[in-house]
Amino acid sequence: MRGSIMILLDEDTRCLVQGITGKQGSFHTRQMLEYGTRIVAGVTPGKGGQEFLGVDVYNSVEEVTEEMDVNASIIFVPAPFAKDAAFESIKHLDLVVIITEHIPVHDSMQIMEYASRMGKTVIGPNTPGIITPGIGKLGIMPTHIFTEGTIGIVSRSGTLTYEFAAQLTEAGFGQSTCVGIGGDPVTGLGFVDVLERFEDDPGTDAVVLIGEIGGDAEERAASYIEQMSKPVFAFISGATAPPGKRMGHAGAIIEGGTGTASSKREALEAAGAVVVDRPSAIVDEIRAQLGVR
């Protein structure tokens, strides 16, 4: 049996899509269904009673939970309405994946505070989501670059996740689960949360951590990596970024001498992680560390 509760997505995950009738929601719902994800309902206020690709659409999350067993949600709702959508999911469901970007920081803070109070798990916002190859995905990642295996990936960057996954797949290293934690300053699950799950997951033999400049998430991850029994390989993007300039993500900014690529690299290496300078170097390092050719 593939999958594990430790890594968030398994055969028992039954998901609804908030914003299923919108452009992004409808496109990615089709992709998720084709990959085998169990999408059991959609939610768009005012569109209840409709159907999309055989999936019934409801007006609210509560309506869905009254009629069927569902335990996860993925949100494609526009930023101004994302907080209300997230609150609705967090109230009723265990796992909420927020794809939406440009959510105001104050809204994100309220979402995370509510999720913490309710004991629920949030991935994102501004995330590509999560994929467990061979099981399903709750997200927007291109599925053809992923394959089943034992390498876990946790990342702040969607596109770099794809680059590393493609490198691993081409070299014959499949992935257990890949989690995008999101590129915003305020997110749900962080590096440490996901690393803990990978450490406990029998289906994961090693982990690739993809960080970037800004904040201290990688430094906090390093403090946990010291305790891990599984090898961790890391990459930090933004090494050439000038201080004070935001690079791509809202969270990718160096301020006050903290959050630099060099400080993150030093912390990770001191914790025992193998840090590479470019995605193409990851395969050789994994081969060397795991003793495979």
UniProtKB/Swiss-Prot annotation:
Active site per database record: H249
Keywords: Ligase, Nucleotide-binding, Tricarboxylic acid cycle
Protein residues bound to CoA: T21, G22, K23, Q24, K47, I99, T100, E101
Domain of life: Archaea
Claim: Ligase is one of the keywords in the record: yes
GO annotation (BP), single: tricarboxylic acid cycle
EC numbers for this chain: 6.2.1.5
GO cellular component, one term: succinate-CoA ligase complex (ADP-forming)
PROSITE patterns for this protein: SUCCINYL_COA_LIG_1, SUCCINYL_COA_LIG_2
Entry binding sites for substrate: Y162
Reaction catalysis annotation: succinate + ATP + CoA = succinyl-CoA + ADP + phosphate; GTP + succinate + CoA = succinyl-CoA + GDP + phosphate
Pfam families cross-referenced by the UniProt entry: CoA_binding, Ligase_CoA
Top EC class for this record: ligase
GO molecular-function terms, A-Z: nucleotide binding; succinate-CoA ligase (ADP-forming) activity; succinate-CoA ligase (GDP-forming) activity
Physiological role: Succinyl-CoA synthetase functions in the citric acid cycle (TCA), coupling the hydrolysis of succinyl-CoA to the synthesis of either ATP or GTP and thus represents the only step of substrate-level phosphorylation in the TCA. The alpha subunit of the enzyme binds the substrates coenzyme A and phosphate, while succinate binding and nucleotide specificity is provided by the beta subunit.
Family affiliation: Belongs to the succinate/malate CoA ligase alpha subunit family.
Subunit (UniProt): Heterotetramer of two alpha and two beta subunits.
Record-given protein name: Succinate--CoA ligase [ADP-forming] subunit alpha
Protein's organism: Methanothermobacter thermautotrophicus (strain ATCC 29096 / DSM 1053 / JCM 10044 / NBRC 100330 / Delta H) (Methanobacterium thermoautotrophicum)
Lineage of the species this protein comes from: Archaea, Methanobacteriati, Methanobacteriota, Methanomada group, Methanobacteria
